[in-house]
Amino acid sequence: MNQQQQQLIQNEFDQLRWYYKNDFEKWAYISFNENQGSLAFFGGTGGNYHLNTTVIVKQIRINGNHLKILKEIFFLSCLKKNRYFVEILDVFLSNDGQKIYIVLKDEGPNLKDYINFYIKNDKLVSFDFFRHIIFQIACGLKILHDKNLIHSDIKHGNIVVSGTGLIKICDLGNTDKISKLKYAGTNGYLSPQVLLGKEMSKEDDMWSLGVVYLELFKKKAGIFSCPLDKKEKIKDCGFKVLKYLLENFYDIKKPNSNWYEENIITNVIINSIKSGEFNMFEYRLKPNLLEVEGLNDDDKEIIKKLLDLNPDKRMNINDLINSSMFQEYNYMFINSDINYREADYERYFGNENTIENNFNQFLNEIKQKINGLTLFNNNN
């Protein structure tokens, strides 16, 4: 992207119609008009921008978040050519150095909007298509998990779907090495362990995938979302959210007793989950939760294993991909590469205290990697 295009984005971004906004960032579809004198809905690939193509621009206020921002850009650069992840095209700082702009290839609507479109227009969606989506998400997660990385925010809004049914995982703002994250994600997609403040793991990604799996067939997002007041932050309400989850979606009982309709979720049960002492009680997903059109017995068993309260029993990514349910899709699996090296990670994030001082230098190096240079792996 040339300087004129970058300047146009900075000048006009705040006047655009954003499709997503929070206190930290804004997202917009942008396009240059034919003479590149203003912005509308804009686009391009590989840094060469053309009319009638679209890209997404993510504006982030830095405001001390140097580490989080740099990690997101770093992992996007590592996955730039990966089949299962959204492609980053460019990144640049605002003139005052207070904001950063991440330019991403527009891969299509997110999964939530995609399903809503079909429901609104009374269009039929193949149940096999849902399974194909889950399989592709699993393939993307395998790329991360094989490198001991976790996405940590898998949900409908972070999966985009192309017109041909290919998916791309997006929003790597919480992606990191295992043991580097303690709390990340979205209400309704957080595992019990995350809600209780434990370090994040691959099993937490699998939980989130289980939620997406169930919600796809129910054609409704946010099924497990706990109602919170506007002033309540999810990270401060872990006990409340977990209690809501257990009371509404699980049957809980003492060992060797009968299942009963009304759960009595006590501190003892939640503390047992926190300590991993699952022999103190028995549990199951409420059977009626899985009574969904198109969900066969194999689907139900996989969802049960993905949403197992015990992370040690939760289905892992390899078992999911190799399960009998997804055998017919295995030929579609593309072992798409990730240009990630532990040495690169340690260079940038090994000493987090240096990030702010070296931010511009590190950003420039990663930008060169995005633009196709081999700075990271150049040993000369």
Q: In which residue ranges do the predicted regions lie?
A:
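Activation segment signature within eukaryotic-like protein kinase domains
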Residues: 133-134
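Conserved catalytic-loop aspartate of Hanks-type protein kinases
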Residues: 205
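C-terminal lobe substrate-recognition/regulatory segment of protein kinase catalytic domains
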Residues: 246-295
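Catalytic-loop of the protein kinase fold
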Residues: 145-161
